[in-house]
Swiss-Prot record:
Chain's gene name: pyrH
Compartments it resides in: Cytoplasm
InterPro entries tied to this protein: AceGlu_kinase-like_sf (IPR036393), Asp/Glu/Uridylate_kinase (IPR001048), Uridylate_kinase (IPR011817), Uridylate_kinase_arch/spir (IPR011818)
Reactions that this protein is recorded to catalyse: UMP + ATP = UDP + ADP
Example GO molecular function: ATP binding
Chief site of localization: cytoplasm
Superkingdom of this protein's organism: Archaea
The name this protein goes by in its record: Uridylate kinase
EC number(s) reported in the record: 2.7.4.22
Organism lineage: Archaea, Methanobacteriati, Thermoplasmatota, Thermoplasmata, Thermoplasmatales
């Protein structure tokens, strides 16, 4: 059994309208069957977070408060996910350090956001760094990293593998602010680069994700030091 892996589970993947209960159950199933001894899962806020943030921003609520609201949404998703995974933590940790300590007790540790200004992708990267985990799977709304937004441009090219700096450059083009919708934020990518954490960006497709967990070839983008594309 391999040592450990961290998964950043985008909130939009599980917290849509309605909440995708079947996906959550399937996700729990493939985790249980995986070869990893320790699995950290960081959940995003999804539609719940975006809905509140969108409305309250129009009412001129400041960005720090909007971030706090987003964090509560991520923690609700985390507790929901943890309740479906046997052998996971019964309470949701508030900090990365708390999550790392829980990884010494539980095979599966699920958490949400931690503090304003940090996306859950950043939290996942910090969890990798703090727990000496070498691979981060980012499950998001696209099946990899593209040179353009694949939802807007039919001719967008998906990279099989790119380097950290190229990924950071592509992420820089995306919008900032609470609740951004990008393949991975700059801070998370910078943490991955400094600690040489391999990032695998992929979609919510459960069969595809299962292949990745098994180490099989799957639709995704690897972000690491290898500059081949």
């Amino acid at each position: 059994m391999n040592e450990s892996i961290v998964i950043s589970l985008g909130g939009s993947v599980i917290s849509g309208d309605p909440i995708d209960a079947d996906y959550m159950k399937s996700f729990a199933r493939i985790l249980e069957a995986s070869k990893y001894r320790r699995v950290g899962i960081v959940t995003g806020g999804g539609r719940t977070a975006r809905s509140y943030i969108s409305v309250l921003r129009k009412l001129n609520v400041n960005e720090n408060v909007l971030d706090e609201i987003g964090i509560y949404a991520t923690r609700m998703n985390a507790l929901s996910m943890a309740s479906l995974i046997p052998g996971s933590n019964p309470t949701i940790p508030f900090t990365v350090e708390d999550a790392v300590n829980l990884m010494n007790t539980y095979r599966f540790v699920v958490m949400g956001g931690t503090e304003p200004g940090h996306t859950t992708d950043t939290v996942a990267a910090l969890l990798c760094e703090r727990s000496a985990t070498r691979t981060l799977i980012n499950v998001t709304s696209v099946d990899g990293v593209y040179d353009m937004d694949p939802h807007r441009f039919a001719n967008a090219k998906r990279f099989d593998r790119i380097g950290y700096r190229e990924a950071i450059a592509l992420s820089t083009k995306s919008s900032a602010g609470a609740g951004p919708n990008v393949f991975m934020d700059i801070t998370a990518l910078t943490i991955a680069m400094r600690s040489r954490i391999r990032v695998i960006v992929t979609s919510r497709d459960i069969d595809n994700l299962e292949k990745i967990l098994k180490g099989d070839r799957a639709v995704s983008t690897f972000i690491d030091d290898d500059q081949r594309s």
